[in-house]
Amino acid sequence: MARYDHLPIYRAAFDLAVHIEKIVRHFSRYHKYTLGTELRDTSRYILERIIEANNSHDRASLLLALRQDLERFKVLARLCHESGGFANTRAYLHVAEQVVAIAKQNEGWLRQT
């Protein structure tokens, strides 16, 4: 099994997952158990995709799937922001910036493949 913890994209995705866990803890009950759960699950799934892509010979298809997962996460985060899940706009913007940074790294990795 290939090492993945040294990858910048993995570290960024891990930081995002930890950040989401901390933020969702402070959501209202409604948002915590609906959109919050989806955000948490998707952030963990993004980590799994990165590990799978690092270990696979067919990396391109997994990175394309990761692109879709990141888009799904962006939509969920925006929906959560628009419906009042995030405490403030700054919290949402921080998450959005992290996702964009991961997406850029994914595109660079995809170009190399």
Language model feature labels by segment:
Residues 1-113:
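Amphipathic alpha-helical assembly/interaction segments
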